[in-house]
Amino acid sequence: MLPWTLLDTAQIPGGADKLRLMCRGSEFSIMLDDIELMNSRVGGSEAALARLSCGRISARGGARILIGGLGMGFTLRAALALLGEKAQLVVAELVPQVVAWARGPLAGVFGASLADPRVSIEETDVGRLIRSARSTYGAILLDVDNGPEGLTRAENDQLYDLRGLSSARAALRPGGVLAVWSSSPDRNFTQRLSRAGLSVEEFRVRANGSRGARHVVWIATRPE
């Protein structure tokens, strides 16, 4: 078996932690310490995040979508496949080097998705875009950290607490969808979504299609 090779590191803004981009043959991994955050061969649940949310609004021709976290682009590519040519997709990525990796060593993984005219990349905290928006987005897709309880960056808690969820609700258009990915279930988070005035469904999805660990996707809808 081929050994893993370190390609690059990236400082997480506002903290001491560093991401590591690793390569083994044609396989890529982004690591935080000894935790694998994402792998180029395992993206089924991230794609499901887009499928379960964008599938509900795909009939709305000019939908504006906000994706929190670029990762390896599984969610972005799945959303592009579902949405029409008039859709607009804004991807917020906190770590500039992750965007550079997507255009560099991970270009083969991303394909043509970053060059799609529907896509714009914002190198910023997705929470800032959410808090500044009012009835703007048809869907907000969050794949930040490992979910509400898998925090690798303390500031991310502001996305998942009641105040953050209320901000997300305000940023959605009536009938819009907040979709949240998590590596594990969280009953308290489900209850917080409801308290924020959202109608909630919870789905268990496989990490890689029909195989792998079971992850969670919440679909929370703002009433019309």
Set out the residue ranges of the language-model regions.
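N-terminal auxiliary segments of SAM/dcSAM-dependent transferases
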Residues: 1-31
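Short N-terminal helix-initiation segments at or just after the protein's N-terminus
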Residues: 10-13, 32, 161-168
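Short, basic/glycine-rich phosphate-binding loops at helix/coil junctions
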Residues: 26-33, 143-148
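Short amphipathic beta-strand/extended segments with alternating polar/hydrophobic composition
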Residues: 36-43
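The AdoMet/dcAdoMet-binding core of the Class I SAM-like
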Residues: 43, 47-172, 180-183, 191, ...
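Glycine-centered, phosphate/nucleic-acid-interacting loop/turn motifs that mediate DNA/RNA or nucleotide
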Residues: 176
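C-terminal lobe and adjacent flexible extensions of AdoMet/dcAdoMet transferase-like proteins
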Residues: 218-224
